[in-house]
């Protein structure tokens, strides 16, 4: 049997499907069966982590769920597996808290046996419900036509039926060719491979920080009332949410743009900074800078760059960013700042912007052997 890929690429796609009486009845029966299964496990399965717990649950619940709740064979298995996962999550939580209740109308579905999606006819077939049309879907749905379908979640909300399908594919094994480096900072993101081939992407940090400041000013204006007054609380929350959504949307778009730039420069390796110690001393920073650092979501941006790169068959490598903005990319000596974010090397005379210096240094680091990568110079850097 082939060994399973450790880190497959996954994407979740939400589709709006047709709502019918049979679908509503199916979801209602599933939720009732899920509630019953949870309380049955509380009484009969003292330790869900012990060996044979799933077999015990199957013996105790399978026939009962099928007959009393009129669930198809595979959906019955999905139901008690779903309940067991919820029960385990509660059981393994040290604080425990209240025993979980099921209110939201959601159904766990297994591909092929519980549901199938036909992307050509734009239909979904669900066991015991039948064929339903796909009414709405994202524009990039066709990109996942060759991906493997995994488990899905069917949700009823605000009179609409949403099917959230997880697609999965294995990472492509590619041979490294050329590479680009990405330098992320608060003003812009620079992508390139040298001081002539690079692109600057402005950030939206200023917009996000503006809405966060509006929320904080509102809280300062009403220091006691903002928690009790529903209108003030709602407005403050909306400002915070808007700031968060701006940066989340920006991070997703940057992932696509970086991959497009890399393809345009003929590279299939993207080098990112290893940010392990990014906020190690964050409490020592000024308050405004600290706020912007949290808002910027460096790791979120890197996550979407890495995800898009793997989706398009590229390699991502994390390299040490130490002194990448102040070391001369030509001779390795420490550079001197002669203007705002502009550095000069006293040894060889090279001058450039610190962001361009950073991508040149980052692109020369890493363990990958690239056919067109510049050779490392035998110079001891002045660190």
UniProtKB/Swiss-Prot annotation:
Keywords: DNA recombination, DNA-binding, Metal-binding, Transposition, Zinc. InterPro entries: Cas12f1-like_TNB, RNA-guided_DNA_endo/Transpos. Zn(2+) binds at residues 328, 331, 345, 348. GO terms for molecular function: DNA binding; metal ion binding. One of its GO terms (biological process) is DNA recombination. The keyword Zinc applies. In the N-terminal section; belongs to the transposase 2 family. NCBIfam families: guided_TnpB, IS200/IS605 family accessory protein TnpB-like domain. This is TnpB-like protein ORF383B. It comes from Acidianus two-tailed virus (ATV).
């Amino acid at each position: 049997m082939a060994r399973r890929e450790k880190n497959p690429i996954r994407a979740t796609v939400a589709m709006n499907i047709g709502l019918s009486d049979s679908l509503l009845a199916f979801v209602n029966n599933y939720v009732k069966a899920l509630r019953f299964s949870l309380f049955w496990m509380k009484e009969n399965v003292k330790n869900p982590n012990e060996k044979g717990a799933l077999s015990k649950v199957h013996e105790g619940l399978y026939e009962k769920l099928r007959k009393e709740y009129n669930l198809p064979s595979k959906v019955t298995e999905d139901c008690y597996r779903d309940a067991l996962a919820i029960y385990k999550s509660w059981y393994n939580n040290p604080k425990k808290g209240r025993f979980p209740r099921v209110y939201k109308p959601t159904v766990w579905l297994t591909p092929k046996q519980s549901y199938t999606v036909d992307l050509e006819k734009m239909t979904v077939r669900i066991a015991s419900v039948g064929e339903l049309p796909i009414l709405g879907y994202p524009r990039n749905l066709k990109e996942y036509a060759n991906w493997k379908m995994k488990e899905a979640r069917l949700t009823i909300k605000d009179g609409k039926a949403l099917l959230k399908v997880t697609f999965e594919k294995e990472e492509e094994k590619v041979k490294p060719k050329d590479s680009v480096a990405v330098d992320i900072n608060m003003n812009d993101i620079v992508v390139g491979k040298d001081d002539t081939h690079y692109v600057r992407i402005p950030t939206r940090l200023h917009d996000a920080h503006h809405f966060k400041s509006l929320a904080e000013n509102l809280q300062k204006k009403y220091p006691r009332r903002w928690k009790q007054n529903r209108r003030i609380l709602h407005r403050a929350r909306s400002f915070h949410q808007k700031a968060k959504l701006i940066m989340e949307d920006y991070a997703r778009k940057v992932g696509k743009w970086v991959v497009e730039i890399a393809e345009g420069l003929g590279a299939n390796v993207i080098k990112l900074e290893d940010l392990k110690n990014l906020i190690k001393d964050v409490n020592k920073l000024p308050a405004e800078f600290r706020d912007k650092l949290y808002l910027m979501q460096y790791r979120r941006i890197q996550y979407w760059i890495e995800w898009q790169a793997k989706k398009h068959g590229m390699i991502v490598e994390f390299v040490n960013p130490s002194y990448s903005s102040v070391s001369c990319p030509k001779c390795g000596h420490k550079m001197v700042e002669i203007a705002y974010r502009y550095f000069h090397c006293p040894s060889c005379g090279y001058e450039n912007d610190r962001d361009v210096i950073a991508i040149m240094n980052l692109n020369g680091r890493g363990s990958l052997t690239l056919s067109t990568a510049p050779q490392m110079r035998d110079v001891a850097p002045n660190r």
